[in-house]
Each structure stands twice: as C-alpha cells, then as structure tokens.
Design a protein with these regions (language model features):
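Conserved functional micro-motifs across diverse proteins
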Residues: 1-172
Length: 172
C-alpha cells in the first residue's frame, strides 16, 4: 500500500540523515546580585575582590596559598543553589578569569560552604535538596590585572560537563 511505502521511505530517510548538531546555549551575563539559572544550578555573584593570599573564607581555618612576587589573588564570591535530583561530586562547575585581549587564568583554589558540617571545603558532594550555599573561586593573576582599570576583566563559568561557557560576570 502507498501508506506503508510512505512510512518505509520516511523511516529510511530518518536513518540516513546525519544527526543535527545542537548549539550550545548562549552564556548568560551575570550582574552582581542577580541570579542566573542553568542546568541544575542557580548562581548569584555576591562579590569580587583582590587579596594578598588565597585562604579559607573562615579566617584562621586551614592553610593559605601565597602568590608569587608580582602576583595577587582575584576572588569571585557567589551563592549556589543545586536543584538536581541526584548527588554530584565537586567540582560541579569551573571558572576562569579573562583579562584584556584574552589573557586567561584558571582557579588556584575553590571553596564551597557545606551546610551539613558548617565549614568551607574544597572537595565533597552536593546532595539533592541542599540549601543554597556560598562558594569562592580564587585565581593567581599578575598585579597588572588588578591595577590596570582600563582593560576588561571577566569571570566565565562552565559546567563540568561542557566546554561552552554558561555564564559571564563582567567585573569591568
């Protein structure tokens, strides 16, 4: 019958067509204090600053990383809400700092606040229904990044499962 021939033709053409590539979602521009949602996360950038060392946000607990001469530490502070239904291991996403004409720096230290143990950690698991928690990513960067206010400075967020940026916070 013509109906069967048409369905066979449709099945054959579906099998021979190459799979369509899906475009990565466009990165969300974050503004200080506003929340961006992606995958199973909501993040809110709460602060950005430069410090002399990367240390546990609970001052006096844990060690500190001291940058080399001529470097400083750039810190991005943000709150995270995980909306997933399964536990995931840290790191669940990453960040990089991009300065000027594409100079890129990767995090030296990542901290997140574990509500269950009331402590800042740099490894662990996030369980479903975990309340919102704080995070800090710290980067060693040349002092020029801090001092040269004329060049752009951005923090780009990625999920651990993708190389496409999911969010961008423009510091300047």
């Amino acid at each position: 019958s013509k109906v069967n021939e048409a369905s066979k033709t449709a099945e054959t053409s579906q099998e021979t067509e190459p799979p369509k590539e899906t475009e990565a979602p466009e990165a969300v521009n974050l503004v200080l204090g506003e929340t961006a949602s992606f995958e199973n996360f909501e993040i809110t950038v709460t602060n950005f600053d430069f410090t002399a060392k990367a240390e546990n946000p609970q001052k006096g607990k844990g060690g500190a990383l001291i940058p080399s001469n001529g470097e400083t530490v750039a810190n991005i502070y943000f709150d995270v809400k995980y909306n997933g239904k399964r536990a995931i291991s840290f790191p669940f996403f990453s960040c990089e700092v991009v300065y000027g004409d594409g100079y890129t720096f990767y995090s030296e230290r990542i901290w997140f606040y574990d509500n269950g143990v009331d402590a800042w950690l740099n490894t662990g698991t996030i369980e479903p229904l975990t309340p919102k928690f704080g995070s800090v990513f710290s980067f060693f960067v040349p002092e020029e990044v801090r001092d040269n206010q004329e060049n752009t400075l951005s923090v780009i967020f990625y999920t651990s499962s993708s190389t496409a940026p999911i969010a961008v916070y423009n510091v300047r």
